[in-house]
Amino acid sequence: MARWAPGASERLRQAALELFAENGFDATTVAEIARRAGVTERTFYRYFADKREVLFAGEEQLEQVFTTAVTTAPANAPLSRLVAAALEAGGRELQDRRGRDYARARDAVITANEQLQERELLKMAKLSRALTSAFVARGSAPMAARLAGELAVSVFGTAFARWIAPGETRDLVELQRDGLAVIAELTHTGSTVETDSPVRG
């Protein structure tokens, strides 16, 4: 087996998802993943720290896509526009990088394993904190930035769940826009109120 086989990273991902679905995450070994992908275990560890990271590799890059959209938005953009820009960029990156079928298969594996669910929640919390910091860096008050960060992650998570639902054909970006429209309707305003009051809790 070649140590640096072309497309090894993608083959390892696909092999892992297949085996997780067939045997369960806990019962699947790195050796089995490598064997199905046609590479050595050493090659596996060149790409991933462990089998869990097959499911979570790339989260830092995705987080950076979200935050870069905030930092590069027009100087006079209101906080509501920064939220929309982050969601647009992050949602498009996710759906273009892996696609709906991969996302569905990955979600099924995570849903079946409590530890993986906890890891996914930590990832989303980290994204919220990163967005909050990016909003503050753009001049938003701390409380408004924190609420906006949590709102963005909530809209993203809700849209993602709809995107991978059986029979859904709309793209993730469109579903995120739907979510933002619902938020605007619920609050009866399209703008974000900012305050200099300190964050509590």
Task: Enumerate the predicted regions with their spans.
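Basic, helix-initiating cap at the start of DNA-binding domains
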Residues: M1-N23, A27-V39
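C-terminal peripheral helix-coil segments that are non-catalytic and often amphipathic
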Residues: V136, E168-G201
